[in-house]
Amino acid sequence: DALVAGMTLNIFNKHSDRVKMACIAQLINVLQSVMLTDGDKMIKTPTYYVFHMMRHHQGAALLDSSLVGGTTVGTGKNELPKVFESVSEDKDGVITVTLTNNSLESSEDVDIMLTNEVTNTV
């Protein structure tokens, strides 16, 4: 769930010129939910923590970014970049970089290049 949420939210952020709002349809006790409950007990799911980490992109300006030396996971039509990323800068100049490693087996070293150009508002 965390990989799907991270990858999807990074893609949405990188396409913020077209995606103005992204929501999760059902919040509790469903697939991809942010919380699970059982009677009076509740836990936050990995999806919750991805949404929590991504919150700094909200209201920020998308910055141009690229990954150098990235590899892929999957094969054929299921092949994806191993790492998805997006970068934003808020009104106070704080830059947020979020990365999603789509591999369940290995880490990936990345280099992120930022330009001074603002492309879209998130």
What are these regions (language model features)?
Residues 79-119:
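Carbohydrate-binding surface patches
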Residues 1-92:
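Aromatic/acidic polysaccharide-binding cleft in carbohydrate-active enzymes
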